[in-house]
């Protein structure tokens, strides 16, 4: 029994940093930055009072299983750098929140699992944390932001990266930086939850590959029962291929494999030739 406990401890240790970021820990991880001083004031928000700080954006954070936000600050005269560190229930939730706020106006940067920023802003995810940083400084503080961001990312999760399922998506035709994770309401259906997506292009047409994690084969079956009730289809539900005739989203080819439902979705509701190859390739990796 002791040997089993030691083995469990060995495997769990690497994950401790993913669940133990207290406000005091986060503040202690802030690096020294020339000319800037870490403020002694730290604000902490939870699901009950997050609206007090970010108001209209709070519902999306809660949908992504937000747990706690720690707000910290550097000061340099009248200038400041604000860091908001959002802790979520899982790394997938943190990645999902980050991906929902990607902006085409920002540059991608090598911080954490993925990052975006400019001369006054930096946003990234690492472990189960989503971090937003910005400054009111009139000059370019991108270097300072990246120094702070990299130091925090290293402490939160030194090996930060995309969720394991995202790494399995086929490379051919993949649009860079288009990966996302949706906790619920994928393509407008509340029962389509825990969905990983990636955008693709093929022969001038765009589409998404998606993977729904049902948690178990029974979980996927329950999702399909709800979907078939919506589409009024009476197809036999068994593992393998199925065509969902969604009256709002067009025909959606899916493939059920174990705890996963893999599919192809096109915003115009079109069927795209050749996507069945990508569908099968992805399913075989799961």
Residues of each region from the PLM?
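Soluble, non-membrane globular domain cores that form compact, hydrophobic packing
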Residues: 18-286
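Bacterial N-terminal signal peptides
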Residues: 7-17
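Positively charged n-region of N-terminal signal peptides that target proteins for export
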Residues: 1-7
């Amino acid at each position: 029994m002791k040997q089993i406990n030691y083995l469990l401890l060995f495997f769990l240790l690497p994950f401790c940093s993913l669940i133990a970021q207290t406000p005091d820990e986060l503040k202690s991880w802030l690096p020294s930055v020339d000319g800037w001083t870490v403020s002694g004031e730290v604000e902490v928000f939870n699901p009950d009072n997050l609206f007090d700080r970010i108001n209209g954006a709070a519902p999306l954070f809660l949908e992504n299983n937000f747990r706690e936000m720690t707000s910290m600050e550097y000061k340099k005269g009248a200038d400041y750098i604000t860091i908001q560190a959002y802790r979520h229930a899982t790394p997938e939730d943190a990645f999902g929140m980050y991906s929902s706020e990607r902006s085409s106006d920002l540059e991608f940067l090598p911080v954490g699992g993925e990052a975006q920023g400019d001369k006054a802003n930096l946003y990234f995810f690492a472990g189960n944390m989503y971090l937003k940083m910005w400054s009111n400084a009139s000059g370019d503080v991108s270097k300072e932001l990246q120094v702070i961001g990299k130091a925090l990312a290293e402490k939160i999760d030194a090996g930060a990266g995309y969720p394991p399922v995202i790494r399995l998506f086929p490379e051919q035709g993949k649009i860079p930086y288009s990966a996302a994770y949706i906790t619920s309401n994928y393509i407008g259906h509340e029962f389509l939850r825990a969905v990983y997506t990636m955008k693709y292009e093929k022969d001038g047409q765009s589409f998404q590959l998606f993977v729904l994690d049902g948690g178990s084969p029974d979980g996927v079956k329950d999702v399909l029962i709800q979907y078939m009730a919506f589409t009024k289809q009476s197809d036999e539900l068994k593992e393998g291929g199925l065509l969902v005739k969604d009256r709002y989203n067009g025909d959606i080819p899916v493939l059920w494999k174990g705890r996963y439902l893999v599919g192809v979705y096109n915003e115009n509701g079109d069927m795209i030739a050749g996507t069945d190859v990508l569908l099968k390739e992805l399913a075989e990796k799961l």
